[in-house]
């Protein structure tokens, strides 16, 4: 039986919200069993702190041997990830293809 823990990012995820969101995601991931789905579709206002939160979630999932799927990641967030050179990491967890 697969246990999916659905999580959602807020509409705004900047430096001001990053610590609280990261702590909540980590808490949820640490209590998960197999698969976690992270819905990023509400994300509208964000900065590089959002990438740090997402990368932290990917790292925690890997450490816990969980499958993390990021859905609804806005195109602008993936473009920012490409700018910082981390798009391949996020693409491995999202429904978006990796950069060419």
Where are these regions (language model features)?
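STAS-like cytosolic regulatory interaction modules
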Residues: 1-46, 56-100
């Amino acid at each position: 039986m697969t246990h999916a823990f659905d999580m959602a990012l807020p509409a705004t995820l900047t430096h001001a919200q990053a610590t609280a969101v990261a702590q909540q995601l980590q808490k949820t991931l640490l209590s998960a069993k197999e698969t976690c789905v992270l819905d990023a579709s509400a994300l509208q206002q964000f900065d590089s702190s959002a990438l740090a939160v997402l990368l932290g979630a990917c790292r925690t999932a890997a450490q816990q041997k969980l499958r993390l799927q990021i859905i609804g990641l806005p195109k602008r967030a993936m473009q920012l990830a490409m700018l910082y050179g981390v798009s391949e990491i996020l693409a491995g967890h999202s429904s978006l293809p990796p950069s060419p």
